């Protein structure tokens, strides 16, 4: 049977594909076939939004053109027949930016830029549907988009200028409702704006591209069945119900796909293959919406976005009593997923997928929704009850049946309904527990006639509490019923200690908490229905427990110092210059590694990794791999021409030989003609193992004495004397979990052999060109000078590409050497997370001695980190943790020790802060316990113990230019700390089940590589005869704005406009022997190198300037050229006077320190563990800022990354050492809605730093730790909750990091948690272990 042609439009151009493969996604087609690389691959599972595009089609049922956003990484091209696709390239370019592109660029909303095109397209789609959106609609548009760099504030602030309801004016003062005016401090004068909205192009909806007329002409043409055949899969697009039922009768195993949001993931990540896929999306009956007498019936193919809009309309016009169920469904849909998923995911698919943690199925089950099932010749209606899901991922449907529709019922008089969900993150997250709850009372009474309590996340399917609910019938809605239900649920809803998903006590407690919320909500509604006399009055302190999550309108302030009035307009230092690549990033023109056009004879590589934590390799079978079309070769350690040993300490291998030491250890690599064939072949490689004992956790390592190197120690004073003189001594321990970098662009390399003298060129996404070069050269057995490494830009790095990127690059270089052809590999997100390691988990055991006044006199901390299977940078990271164990406090008698645990996990590595945040969190943890034990305000104890100017640290470095007290006092004042503390106490008295916390935290962060010789930077400056300047330096651009700052430095040094200066890339053949772009020091080191090179040029131009004092610049340059004077210069800088000895505790490890203070307020839900970040005020000393926009962006971005570290991001490993959390669906980084509602950042004024270029300071890492103010505010709120339930206010309790909903809920001990205590049998292995 012949296949049909696929016809669709992309950016107005017609595309006819004669060989459409159902396995090809729109993303792959756009990038590889059409060369449209603006759309990015961030995760491949619809979780990050980097691949967002807009789809436009004529909707025959609504009789209109509709526009909606989709994830191109999940959309099969076969689903796009007769639609129009718009990508970021289709709406504007750098010659003429669309207003959406312009505003994100000019409001500084693009740092690394990898997420930017997807965010642009989400906003563009909103504006196509709603040219004048509200602020809330704008925020909701980004629920399916993630950004790891910016902290989201500048994106939202830029796009709020489109809003009709008080769009931000950016501080221009033209808006009477301006957020800055509303919250303006009296203590500091307002800065100029970071951007001026008046400069923005207005949005003109009439100028948008039209829907293709050819597609519009087809609207009345009957749709016909289509067939597309790929290499392994056939896709049939059914156009009528009859065709569909016939197909299902003939092929009962055929998969029905509408949005591909589930099947696509199963095929990609679970290696499932469905040879026949049938798409029923066109069938009218499956898309119909029917308003019946008992409810609204939705066809099974109706997208969830349509369900949402229909129910919203009904809720607006129907009586409240009739829409109880509708509002429950809407509450679940609110947090269900991003717009991209809801636009295509069908209501029927959501039901039939039968997920045990479905958001919607418990709601449908509790509501008694009716399902209509049809097959050829039969039709039946069933109620969705406990029998509908007979087992894991199973339904009552017969193989030949399909779901035709679902009827969501109207609620009756006396019926109440609520829906609940708790996840790690509110937006776009998989639930831990979901629930639908319904009660129907006998008319005019509070006696229960029907009660339905349904749950997801409590079994292998959606369940109903069938033992508990019948016992409540005919009971009155009162305290007695509450106790009965809670006892019943605790008994009925048991979970095994090793239940998949873990968090057993938390999940069990949530079922009771949800019912308690439902009980209170119903009680409240009964009171409004004049039944208060029967049921009793709701305690007013309980009322807030019934409130659904509401977010106040955001308010943001950014304060910075203006440049001097006499500064030349051409001198851009100190001005908020946008990132130089922002326009290219916003238009999709910025080129990342995988965007480089493919070579004609290019091959693709996929890694083959270990599935065991520690084992001998007994055999490798490649026979199945070789059968895959396009297979070229399989590489192992035997193929390495020179040295298989690699890594910073030669303790790693290019490929594992004989033995593997972690899950994810690279054993070999498959090379094939396409990425898809390479991946299939890699999965076909079968490896057998002989398991060896594995060490997974820090505790395992301690028990087995498994460490790297000797103990590291810093000691000062007389510890014994200090403890003996102390009034109080407190001991304890703190565990700090690891963190995944989650740069949006995964590791990527293209290796191109040059065919002579062993030369090779590598295009790499790396922070470390030098080590990439030397590791490849060593592996191949050639001198470094034969290997050129080039980096244009990275889509984020954060330390994750400092050393670990080399494991990919080295394998690629071997493949290119072996085949003699260019080879490319961009890791999939799950591979990247599995292989590359992350932030080190820490365990600290501390003992602190202090006086009754709160003065700390003695401290001892033993630090243990989980280093993983190789040493990598673990020792330097532990050293920095010890250097920062004091944070900002003078402790006369102190000892800090550090051990790095050698475990069978992927090697952990550098991550923004480099051990500093772990050391400082421990310091603030015991400091908070000192304050509690003394009964003193924490802020007083912190201030009392703080260093002063000229003090020596515990490692004997003198503090000079110590601005921290200024930052502290300014933050106390600008945050109105003392007044707000009283307000928090008042709120906590008035609310039993919601509590607020407030905390202020300082940071002191040392700037320099602690390995002295790394503190060097270089630059190369070429001046061309037209006066243009090409600048190269040793640092790489990963979104932090380094290139922009270097151009600003060169501009001031040469006294020419920034427009004359260009940076193309970083490469080993321009600036050699570079230090990694890390340690926050790159602007300092390379900036000074740039300055030196520019000075050399200026000296050479001096004679020509004297001859022509008025210039212009171009004349001096031409005169120098014609006089045969070199117009090329290098510059070099090394940081002076560095070097510390652990043996003698002397010398300076740091050139200077950066300081900052943050005050944060949170509100926790004691029943669910949920929290919201109400407000954060930050005062940061960045010296004389080179670029306030970039520096504020770094402060906000680092803070939000720290927010993830301390409250949200949690890695789950199995007891066998296998990572569970391998993508955005299971690993949650902060989203748009996670940031503080009020976010106020102030750069300290008048604090020039004499030790760095143009008096600036480092900013990349220091602000991250300030997010611990959120952690400690949460702990403050938990303490208030525990005090309410009988805990002594001075009683200490352990709260490990991150403070996830699970930890918050479990710490808020109450009558519900005590019912759900779950013992763990001795030999039971839990689902995940604390590594």
Swiss-Prot record:
Compartment(s) of residence: Peroxisome; Cytoplasm; Secreted
Post-translational modifications: Subject to partial proteolysis; this alters the enzyme from the dehydrogenase form (D) to the oxidase form (O).
UniProt domain FAD-binding PCMH-type: residue ranges: 228-413
Domain 2Fe-2S ferredoxin-type: 4-91
Active-site feature positions: 1261
Cofactor note (record): Binds 2 [2Fe-2S] clusters per subunit.
Binding site for [2Fe-2S] cluster 1: 43, 48, 51, 73
Cofactor: [2Fe-2S] cluster; FAD; Mo-molybdopterin
Disulfide partners: 535-992
Assigned GO CC terms: cytosol; extracellular space; peroxisome; sarcoplasmic reticulum
Regulation acting on activity, per entry: Can be converted from the dehydrogenase form (D) to the oxidase form (O) irreversibly by proteolysis or reversibly through the oxidation of sulfhydryl groups.
SMART domains: Ald_Xan_dh_C (SM01008), CO_deh_flav_C (SM01092)
Positions of substrate binding: 802, 880, 914, 1010
GO molecular function: 2 iron, 2 sulfur cluster binding; FAD binding; flavin adenine dinucleotide binding; hypoxanthine dehydrogenase activity; hypoxanthine oxidase activity; identical protein binding; iron ion binding; molybdopterin cofactor binding
Entry binding sites for Mo-molybdopterin: 767, 798, 912, 1079
Alphabetical keyword list: 2Fe-2S, Cytoplasm, Disulfide bond, FAD, Flavoprotein, Iron, Iron-sulfur, Metal-binding, Molybdenum, NAD, Oxidoreductase, Peroxisome, Secreted
Entries under Pfam families matching the protein: Ald_Xan_dh_C, CO_deh_flav_C, FAD_binding_5, Fer2, Fer2_2, MoCoBD_1, MoCoBD_2
Induction and repression of expression: By interferon.
Enzyme class, first EC level, given as a word: oxidoreductase
Effect the entry attributes to changing residue 992 to R: Slows the conversion from the dehydrogenase form to the oxidase form. Abolishes conversion from the dehydrogenase form to the oxidase form
EC number: 1.17.1.4, 1.17.3.2
Residue positions binding [2Fe-2S] cluster 2: 112, 115, 147, 149
PANTHER family reported in the protein's UniProt record: XANTHINE DEHYDROGENASE
Function field: Key enzyme in purine degradation. Catalyzes the oxidation of hypoxanthine to xanthine. Catalyzes the oxidation of xanthine to uric acid. Contributes to the generation of reactive oxygen species.
Family (UniProt): Belongs to the xanthine dehydrogenase family.
Protein name per its UniProtKB record: Xanthine dehydrogenase/oxidase
Organism encoding this protein: Rattus norvegicus (Rat)
The encoding gene: Xdh
């Amino acid at each position: 049977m012949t296949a049909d042609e696929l016809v669709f439009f992309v950016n107005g151009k017609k595309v006819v594909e004669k060989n459409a493969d159902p396995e090809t996604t729109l993303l792959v087609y756009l990038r590889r076939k059409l060369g449209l690389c603006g759309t990015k691959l961030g995760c491949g599972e619809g979780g990050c939004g980097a691949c967002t595009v807009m789809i436009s089609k004529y909707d025959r049922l609504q009789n209109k053109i509709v526009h909606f956003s989709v994830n191109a990484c999940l959309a099969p091209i076969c689903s796009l027949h007769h639609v129009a696709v718009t990508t970021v390239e289709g709406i504007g370019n750098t010659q003429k930016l669309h207003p959406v592109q312009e505003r994100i660029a000019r409001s500084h909303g693009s740092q690394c830029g990898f997420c930017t095109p997807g965010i642009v397209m989400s906003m563009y789609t909103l504006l196509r549907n709603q040219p004048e959106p509200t602020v809330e609609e704008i925020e909701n548009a980004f629920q399916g988009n993630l950004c790891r760099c910016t902290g989201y504030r500048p994106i939202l602030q830029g796009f709020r200028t489109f809003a009709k309801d008080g769009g931000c004016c950016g501080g221009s003062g033209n808006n009477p409702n301006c957020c800055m005016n509303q919250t303006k401090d009296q203590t500091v004068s307002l800065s100029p704006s970071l951007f001026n909205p008046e400069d923005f192009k207005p949005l003109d909806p009439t100028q948008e591209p039209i829907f293709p007329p050819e597609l519009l002409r087809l609207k009345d043409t009957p749709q016909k069945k289509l067939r597309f055949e790929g290499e392994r899969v056939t896709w049939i697009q059914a156009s009528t119900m009859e065709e569909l039922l016939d197909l299902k009768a003939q092929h009962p195993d055929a998969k029905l796909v509408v949005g591909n949001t589930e099947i696509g993931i199963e095929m990609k990540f679970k290696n499932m293959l469905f040879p026949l896929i049938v798409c029923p999306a066109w069938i009218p009956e499956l898309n119909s919406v029917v308003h019946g007498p008992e409810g609204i019936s939705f066809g099974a193919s109706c997208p969830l976005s349509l369900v949402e809009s229909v129910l919203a309309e009904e809720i607006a016009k129907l009586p409240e009593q009739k829409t109880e169920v509708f509002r429950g469904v809407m509450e679940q849909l609110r947090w269900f997923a991003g717009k991209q998923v809801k636009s295509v995911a069908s209501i029927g698919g959501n039901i039939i997928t039968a997920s045990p943690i479905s958001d919607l199925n418990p709601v449908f089950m509790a509501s008694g929704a009716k399902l209509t099932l049809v097959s050829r010749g039969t039709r039946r209606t069933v109620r969705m009850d406990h029998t509908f899901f007979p087992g894991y991922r199973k339904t009552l449907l017969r193989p030949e049946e399909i779901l035709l529709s679902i009827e969501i019922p109207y609620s009756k008089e006396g019926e109440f309904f609520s829906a609940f969900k708790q996840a790690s993150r509110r937006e776009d997250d998989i639930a831990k527990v979901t629930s639908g709850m319904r009660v129907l009372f006998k008319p005019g009474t509070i006696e229960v006639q029907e009660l339905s309590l349904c749950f997801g996340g409590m079994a292998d399917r959606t369940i109903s509490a069938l033992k508990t609910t019948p016992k409540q019938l005919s009971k009155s809605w009162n305290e007695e019923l509450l106790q009965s239900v809670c006892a019943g649920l605790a008994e009925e809803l048991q979970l095994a200690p090793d239940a998949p998903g873990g968090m057993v006590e938390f999940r069990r407690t949530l079922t009771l908490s949800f019912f308690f919320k439902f009980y209170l909500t119903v009680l409240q509604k009964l009171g409004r229905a004049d039944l208060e006399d029967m049921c009793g009055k709701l305690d007013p302190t309980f009322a807030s427990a019934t409130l659904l999550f509401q977010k106040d309108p955001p308010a943001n302030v950014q304060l910075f110092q203006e440049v001097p009035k006499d500064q030349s307009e051409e001198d851009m230092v100190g001005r908020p210059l946008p990132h130089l690549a922002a326009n290219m990033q916003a238009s999709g023109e910025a080129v990342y590694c995988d965007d480089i056009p493919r070579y004609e004879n290019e091959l693709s590589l996929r890694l083959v990794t270990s599935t065991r934590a520690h084992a001998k390799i007994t055999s490798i079978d490649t026979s199945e791999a070789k059968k895959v079309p396009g297979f070229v070769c399989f590489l192992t350690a035997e193929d390495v021409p020179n040295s298989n040993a690699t890594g910073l300490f030669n303790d790693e291998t290019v490929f594992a030989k004989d033995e593997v030491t972690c899950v994810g250890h690279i054993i070999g690599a498959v090379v094939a003609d396409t990425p898809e064939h390479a991946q299939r072949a890699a999965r076909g490689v079968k490896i057998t193992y002989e398991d060896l004992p594995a060490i997974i956790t820090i505790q395992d390592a301690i028990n087995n004495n498994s460490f790297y190197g000797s103990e590291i120690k810093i000691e000062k004073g007389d510890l014994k004397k200090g403890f003996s003189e102390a009034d109080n001594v407190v001991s304890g321990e703190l565990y700090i979990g690891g963190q995944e970098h989650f740069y949006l662009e995964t590791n990527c390399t293209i290796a191109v052999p040059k065919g002579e003298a062993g030369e090779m060129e590598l295009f790499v996404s790396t922070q470390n060109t030098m080590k990439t070069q030397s590791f490849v050269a060593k592996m191949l057995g050639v001198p470094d000078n034969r290997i050129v490494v080039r980096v244009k830009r990275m889509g984020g790095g954060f330390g994750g590409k400092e050393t670990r990127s080399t494991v990919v690059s080295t394998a690629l270089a071997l493949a290119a050497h072996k085949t003699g052809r260019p080879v490319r590999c961009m890791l999939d997100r799950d591979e990247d997370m599995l292989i590359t390691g992350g932030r080190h988990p820490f365990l600290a055991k501390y003992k602190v001695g202090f006086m009754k006044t709160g003065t700390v006199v003695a401290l001892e901390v033993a630090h243990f980190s989980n280093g993983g299977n190789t040493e990598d940078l673990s020792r330097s990271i532990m050293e920095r943790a010890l250097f920062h164990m004091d944070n900002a406090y003078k402790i006369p008698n102190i000892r800090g020790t550090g051990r790095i645990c050698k475990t069978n996990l992927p090697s952990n590595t550098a991550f923004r802060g480099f051990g500093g945040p772990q050391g400082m969190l421990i310091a603030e943890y015991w400091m908070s316990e000192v304050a509690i034990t003394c009964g003193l305000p924490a802020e007083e104890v912190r201030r009392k113990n703080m260093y002063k100017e000229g003090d020596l640290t515990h490692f004997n470095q003198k503090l000079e230019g110590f601005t921290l007290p200024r930052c502290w006092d300014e933050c106390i004042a600008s945050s109105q700390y003392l007044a707000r503390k009283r307000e928090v106490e008042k709120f906590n008295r008035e609310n039993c089940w919601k509590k607020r916390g407030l905390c202020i935290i300082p940071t002191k962060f040392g700037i320099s590589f602690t390995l002295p010789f790394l503190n060097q930077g270089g630059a190369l400056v070429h001046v061309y005869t037209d006066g243009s300047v090409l600048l190269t330096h040793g640092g790489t651009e990963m979104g932090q704005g380094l290139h922009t700052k270097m151009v600003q430095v060169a501009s001031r040094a040469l006294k020419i406009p920034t427009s004359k200066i260009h940076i193309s890339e970083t490469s080993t053949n321009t600036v050699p022997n570079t230090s990694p772009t890390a340690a926050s020091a790159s602007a300092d080191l390379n900036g000074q190198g740039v300055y030196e090179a520019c000075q050399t040029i200026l000296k050479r131009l001096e004679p020509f300037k004297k001859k022509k004092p008025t210039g212009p610049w171009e004349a001096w340059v031409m005169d120098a050229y014609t006089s045969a004077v070199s117009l090329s210069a290098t510059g070099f800088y090394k940081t002076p006077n560095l070097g510390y000895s652990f043996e003698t505790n002397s010398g300076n490890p740091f050139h200077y320190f950066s300081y900052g203070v943050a005050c944060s307020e949170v509100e926790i839900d004691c029943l669910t563990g949920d929290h919201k970040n109400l407000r954060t005020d930050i005062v940061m000393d960045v010296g004389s800022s080179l670029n306030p926009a970039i520096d504020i962006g770094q402060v906000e971005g680092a803070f939000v990354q720290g927010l993830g570290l301390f409250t949200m991001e949690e890695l789950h490993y199995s007891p066998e050492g296998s990572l569970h959390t391998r993508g955005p669906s299971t690993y949650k980084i902060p989203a748009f809605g996670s940031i503080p509602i009020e976010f106020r950042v102030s750069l300290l004024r008048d604090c020039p730093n004499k030790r760095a270029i143009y008096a600036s300071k480092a900013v990349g890492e220091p602000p991250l730790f300030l997010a611990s103010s959120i952690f400690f505010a949460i702990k403050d709120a938990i303490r208030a909750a525990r005090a309410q339930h009988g805990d002594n206010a001075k009683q200490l309790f352990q709260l490990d990091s991150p403070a996830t909903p699970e930890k918050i809920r479990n710490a808020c001990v109450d009558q519900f948690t005590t019912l759900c205590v779950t013992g763990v049998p001795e030999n039971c292995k839990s689902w995940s272990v604390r590594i």
